[in-house]
């Protein structure tokens, strides 16, 4: 994680682990946090509540993002918003990378 970024290629940060999802904290500021989550097909992050809002931006792959009772089938360039306090989860059908822009916490 860095406090200040001028520029970097996010593709260079994408990595996968067959044993568990990979999460990289890219940036943490007083206004937002940026995280990169990389999952192999079948590595689900089960729906769970979180106290902060997040904007998911799908970079690569296909899967389903759950927010509350809604399920969204997503592919690259899809954007999903999960409000503060909502239940959210990720279920990739293929290898998948997602950029999350989070409310600071």
Annotate each language-model stretch with its function.
Residues 69-84:
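Short acidic-glycine-tyrosine-enriched beta hairpin
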Residues 1-31, 66:
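A short, N-terminal "cap"/entry segment at the start of jelly-roll beta-barrel domains
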Residues 19-20, 33-50:
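Conserved short histidine dyad/triad with adjacent acidic residue
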Residues 59-60, 75-76, 94:
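A cytosolic small-molecule/anion-sensing beta-strand core signal
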Residues 52-64, 68:
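Glycine- and acidic-residue-biased ligand/ion/polar-headgroup-sensing regions
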Residues 84-105:
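Ligand-binding loop in jelly-roll beta-barrel domains
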């Amino acid at each position: 994680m860095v406090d200040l970024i001028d520029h970097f290629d996010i593709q260079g940060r994408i990595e996968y682990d067959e044993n568990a999802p990979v999460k990289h904290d890219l940036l943490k500021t007083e206004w937002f946090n940026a995280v990169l989550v990389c999952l192999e097909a079948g590595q689900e992050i089960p729906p769970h509540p979180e106290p902060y809002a997040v904007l998911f931006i799908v970079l690569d792959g296909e899967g389903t993002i759950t927010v509350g009772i809604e399920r969204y089938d997503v592919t690259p360039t899809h954007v999903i918003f999960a409000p503060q306090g909502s239940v959210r989860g990720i279920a990739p059908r293929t290898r998948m990378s997602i950029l999350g822009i989070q409310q600071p916490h």
